[in-house]
Regions:
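Short beta-strand/loop motif that positions the catalytic acidic residue
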Residues: 433, 439-441
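C-terminal catalytic histidine-bearing segment of alpha/beta-hydrolase fold enzymes
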Residues: 447-450, 454-496
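Alpha/beta-hydrolase fold nucleophile elbow
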Residues: 343-356
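Cap/lid segment of the alpha/beta-hydrolase catalytic domain
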Residues: 266-327, 339, 388-391, 395
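N-terminal cap/lid segment of alpha/beta-hydrolase-fold proteins
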Residues: 93-97, 206-251
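Short beta-strand element of the alpha/beta-hydrolase
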Residues: 243-245, 253-263
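Hydrolase active-site cap/lid region
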Residues: 360-412, 468, 476-479
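Glycine-biased, low-complexity coil/linker segments
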Residues: 71-72
Length: 496
């Protein structure tokens, strides 16, 4: 039970039950149901007993009589495991982490226990261009600290990874320094029929009517935002895109934001905050399944039918899993364009697409393929520069041609697979973009190497904003998230 929601909910607010109606068939209320006070009529009002029960629960919580665990199944408040007492930090001597080719990079390594340097710490370190370490050594830090130097003669990222061995356990820390990053060039080659392939894919997808459906979610709606679970057809009959739609309750024409997901299988909640800023928000899933089920439902799929879906169909551009994912993103914009619900519709000119990791790639692809997109945000974009590893340069997730165990390119890559993946390389989409974009990523990212993220930024067309956060790995800081959203809002509100 969401007690915060109970606190914020007006006691006299009418709550609505779910009711499914096709998009475009909106009525005077968000559900399309008939006004009334019985549940069967579509509405009910909390009775006196319910109100008293909520009030009692709040009082009991304040008094500490009721409590809920932070983790586990037992009662009471429990402490949680957060971090480790042993830490390994690696810090460059340039505050911006940026160096020129051939310049000496000086790293300071500290191993600490309870915040103080740990004398006699045994470490193993490796360093070199990211994904391709050239030096591996063991040493003892008599006073818990040391300085290690290196250099790189070509543009890229130079990484020092340190593993401390303490009491039979290993603790890691690393740092990737940027070396003339503005000169990084991706290796991705582009098929001659790239544009024709995608134009045909989108055209064929649109042979299938959208047939959208919308389901009002009263428990996720507020006085300012109506929230819906929606779906619409993708590239063939029966294959639907499911999403969470947030729209302002006030009728009018609004800019729109399409949120595209990172890798995985999960439910979605939408973006109430962004919607409250005066925007339509559509957050889509990519697997053709509803996005409001319990997490266990998605975990089962992720470990079975959808396990490693990013490897499905690599041998054939028409069988590649991401083909219907990308057409689904285009159909999502088709849905936004035709949206009319309770007097709310898209303004027809301001539309952003954004996401991180896999979602960063999908942002690049959608923007490149759909001229209705007016701006985009790509944060640590994955699936960029697949074949870079074949030239011993860091490649993007999911590292199709890189042997992570051996830290080298895979043996005997299939030339056909190399060719087919070029149709799904974020670099080839970025080169075709002409509208403003926001890029952000971390230099310490082990999933999406910054070499690929920076190289993709370097070749992207249009006006672009770069905001790296060097210390981040495959995550973002609150300040980074706030900046990202502020940039999107500024772009969407430029042309009211």
């Amino acid at each position: 039970m969401d007690f915060d929601a109970l606190e914020k909910q007006p006691q006299n607010r009418t709550r609505r039950v779910r009711h499914v109606v096709p998009v475009g068939y909106g009525t005077s209320n968000p559900t399309g149901a008939v006004e009334g006070h019985r549940v069967g009529a579509g509405f009910y009002k909390p009775n006196k007993t319910e109100k008293e029960m909520k009030r009692l629960l709040r009082i009991l919580l304040l008094l500490g009589i009721l409590s809920f665990p932070f983790r586990g199944t037992g009662g009471g408040l429990q402490a949680q495991i957060i971090g480790t007492n042993i830490t390994v930090t690696v810090t460059p001597d340039h505050k911006d982490w940026v160096y020129k080719t051939g310049e000496t990079i000086t790293f300071t390594v500290d191993v600490r226990k309870s915040g103080t340097l740990l004398d006699g710490a045994n470490i193993t370190y490796e360093m070199g261009p990211e994904l391709y370490p050239e030096v591996k050594k063991d040493m003892v830090l008599k006073e818990g600290t040391t300085v290690i130097k290196g250099k790189m003669t070509k543009p890229g990222f130079y990484k020092l990874k340190v593993t401390a061995h303490v009491a039979g356990k290993d603790y890691e820390g690393w740092c990737s320094a940027a070396v003339s990053p503005e000169q990084i060039q991706p290796t991705a080659q582009c098929p001659k029929d790239f544009d024709a392939f995608w134009a045909k894919a989108i055209e064929e997808a649109r042979w299938t009517a959208l047939e959208p459906h919308i389901e009002f979610l009263p428990e996720r709606s507020t006085p300012d935002v109506n929230t819906y679970h929606v779906s619409f057809q993708n590239d063939r009959w029966g294959r639907r895109v499911y999403a969470i739609l947030n729209v302002p309750t006030k009728p009018g024409k609004y800019p729109a934001l399409l949120r595209v997901p990172g890798a995985g299988v999960r439910p979605y909640t939408g973006d109430e905050w962004f919607c409250k800023q005066g925007c339509i928000v559509l957050e889509i899933g990519i697997h053709g399944i509803p996005v409001t089920n319990p997490q266990a439902y998605y975990d089962n799929l992720y470990s079975a039918a959808l396990a490693g879906y990013w490897h499905h169909g690599l041998h054939d551009r028409n069988e590649n899993y991401y083909k219907h994912v990308i057409t689904g993103c285009i159909r999502a914009i088709d849905f936004i364009e035709t949206l009319q619900t309770n007097g709310v519709e898209w303004d027809g000119q301001n539309l952003a697409v954004t996401g991180s990791s896999q979602g960063g790639f999908l942002s690049l692809a959608t923007t490149a393929l759909d001229k209705r997109v007016s701006c985009y945000g790509a944060v640590h974009a994955a699936l960029c520069d697949h074949e870079a590893s074949l030239k011993r340069q860091a490649c993007g997730w999911p590292h199709y041609f890189y042997d992570e165990g051996q830290q080298r390119p895979i043996d005997h890559p299939d030339p056909n697979v190399v060719e087919q993946t070029r149709y799904y390389d974020g670099v080839n989409f970025a080169r075709r973009i002409t509208v403003p974009g926001y890029f952000s990523f971390g230099y310490n990212d082990n999933v999406v190497p910054p070499t690929t993220a920076y190289g993709t930024y370097n070749v992207a067309g249009g006006d672009k904003t770069l905001s790296p956060y060097p210390k981040t790995a495959h995550f973002w800081y609150q300040e980074q998230w706030d900046e990202w959203n502020a940039w999107l809002l500024q772009q969407l509100k430029k042309n009211p």
